[in-house]
Curated annotation (Swiss-Prot):
Compartment list: Cell outer membrane
InterPro entries: LolA/LolB/LppX (IPR029046), OM_lipoprot_LolB (IPR004565)
Any one annotated GO CC term: cell outer membrane
Keyword vocabulary terms for this entry: Cell outer membrane, Chaperone, Lipoprotein, Membrane, Palmitate, Protein transport, Signal, Transport
Signal peptide span: 1-21
Protein name: Outer-membrane lipoprotein LolB
Function comment: Plays a critical role in the incorporation of lipoproteins in the outer membrane after they are released by the LolA protein.
Source organism per UniProt: Haemophilus influenzae (strain ATCC 51907 / DSM 11121 / KW20 / Rd)
Alphabetical list of SUPFAM superfamilies matching this protein: Prokaryotic lipoproteins and lipoprotein localization factors
GO-annotated biological processes: lipoprotein localization to outer membrane; protein transport
Length: 209
């Protein structure tokens, strides 16, 4: 891409265009009851989602940080840690961003033909979009699979209720608010990082795996 300023200007317009009037509930739920992690139904479900290696998810995402605030439709396609795509788009403005992970790093592009690539995906996300979200971990968080070293809780629905996970010196928390009744996959997820003051609220409307 020849003009970084043009790309940044576009992403600013994109964020403005997809802002919605609804507000994100930034507070974690309270008085939630949990059950033991050895619960047989949960262990069976955990084995099921661990076998899901590649999948697609579609829905809506809302993001709040001290410098950015936007809401967007999204399409997530995941194959492996070195091959995934996150598409952010607006049904109103037709603005679209593609975030693509590949063997040599990450590429972010838009529907105007702007494109930027870098080997360091974390820095590229921060520079272009202003997000500091570990997408490599989001692949597991999205489907409700806690990391092996994560401190997590199981809800009374026998599914993942919440977890705490440390990434790059800061702590992320996740609360799984609702699940789809037909496949027991997450529907509404609240992700927060209090140290970086980031909130990510995700609603998954469709799962394909």
């Amino acid at each position: 891409m020849n003009n970084m300023k043009t790309f940044k200007f576009f992403t600013a317009l994109f964020a403005t265009a997809i802002l919605t009037a609804c507000t994100l509930d930034m507070e974690r739920p309270t008085n939630v009851q949990y059950i033991d992690k050895t619960d047989a139904i949960w262990q069976q479900h955990l084995q099921k989602i661990q076998k899901i290696q590649s999948y697609q998810a579609k829905g809506q995402i809302g993001y709040i940080s001290p410098t950015e605030r936007f809401s967007s439709r999204f399409e997530w396609q995941y194959q492996n840690p070195k091959s995934y795509t996150l598409k952010l788009y607006s049904l109103i403005s037709k603005s679209t961003l593609w975030i693509q992970m590949h063997q040599s790093g990450m590429t972010i592009s838009d529907n105007n033909g702007n494109q930027q690539s870098a080997a360091n995906s974390k820095l590229l996300l921060q520079e272009i979009i202003g997000m500091d979200v570990p997408l490599e971990h989001l692949a597991y968080w999205l489907k409700g699979q806690p990391a092996m070293n994560a401190d997590y809780q199981v809800g009374t629905n026998h599914l993942l209720g919440a977890f705490t996970y440390h990434v790059d010196g800061s702590q992320w928390t996740a609360d799984y608010l609702t699940y789809h009744s037909n496949n027991s996959m997450p529907e509404n997820i609240l992700l927060k990082n209090d140290s970086t003051k980031q909130t990510l609220k995700i609603r998954v409307d469709e799962w394909i795996y």
